[in-house]
């Protein structure tokens, strides 16, 4: 329970760190933009480039966060898989039960039914072939 709480706190801290990083860059960009506007006439290309840089910075932060979350999820799944695959002592003591059921006969009967239905469809085509040509 404590490890899960620590993982949640770590995830929240990382998300907030990435968001703060993006917001700091955006605020710096907007400050430059408004400072430039006061001293000079506003150039549309300059503002557009600054906004694109801010957007790319935020997008890169979120993509790196997404990659980190995917990495953590993968590690957790691998760890859980290792825990599940380890046999317990109770399972080793029980004898292995082998069931011998006639599965082969059931499969053969089902395959025969499928083949017969396909053959019947095939022969029905030849049966009604003359009707097909008469309608043309």
Curated annotation (Swiss-Prot):
Domain of life where this protein originates: Bacteria
Keyword entries, A-Z: Membrane, Transmembrane, Transmembrane helix
Transmembrane segments: 7-27
Topological relation to the membrane, as annotated: Single-pass membrane protein
One GO CC annotation: membrane
Record has Transmembrane as a keyword: yes
Pfam families according to UniProt: DUF5426
Protein's cellular compartments: Membrane
Protein known as: Uncharacterized protein MG441 homolog
Organism: Mycoplasma pneumoniae (strain ATCC 29342 / M129 / Subtype 1) (Mycoplasmoides pneumoniae)
